[in-house]
Amino acid sequence: MAQEPRVSRRAFLAALGATSATSAKAQHAAQPFALPDLPGPLRPLGGLVLAPDMLGGGGFSGVHLAPDLTLTLISDRGHWAEARLLLDGLTPIGLQPLRHGPLRDEAGKPIPRGFAADAEALARRPDGTWLVAFERRHRIRAYRRLDGPGAYVAAPPGLEAAPPNGGLESLAVLQDGRLFAIAEIFTPPDRPELRHAWLGAPGRWTPLYWQPAPGFHPTDAAILPDGRALVLERRFSLLGGFSARLVMTAHDALRSAREGAVLRGETILLLNDAPLPSENWEAVAVTRLGDQTLVALISDDNESVLQRSLLLLFAWRG
């Protein structure tokens, strides 16, 4: 008869200690909080208060969530981080840091923090290539690995004329591999209510326009499995602080868009402290988990003690 393997007390306690340490580290990297239920196509699952020091720093401005729950973040301070989103059922309960590091230039050298390191949007192409859009020096870099060199790819034509702090903040990959990009505060001279936007790929961009709500600016976009786009829009005033809204395009808006088309969305979520927290909401991601579609939102703390890095998680029920 085969004997069951015996585990020594020392090995058992070591394994238990490692598990406890991992759990404590996950809890230290993010503290969960509950969200109220809301009507509409998004079912709130919960939120996390992130600990940026466990992720290499704050200032998160772009996010990607993979089906295996790997959360990838970029910062407008020029670094990236990976962590595992921990769920109890579908409720977020913690974040397990995996690795982090600086974004690098084409020679593999860390991009100096400051003007050149203002990374604002993150997307992943079907072949696994990461695309990172930068403001101030408006450009897009492509990375096979985020810890490797990042080569320039052709940005949308005319983007160099965008205001220093108003370039690409929204970058998303459609199911057919095309990119959807929106500039934050880059407007046509005769239509200040619009923002320059594009569909296509490096070297093959089709110019469009995005129309945000009055007073709002687009900060990120993600694509639902049915091809509709979610666009995150933010507003700030000295008296009112931050507020945001998440909007959704019509079913055929991206598929049928032609050069010069004006795209807009319908509001599906408000983030203005009633009842969801009002913060500097910067990034949105969509992924599939089994038969569920998950939507994640990330706020940018600007590395300020007056702001927070938050993650909100929703299940799509639209």
Language-model-derived ranges and their functions:
Residues 2-7, 12-318:
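Sequence/structural signature of beta-propeller domains
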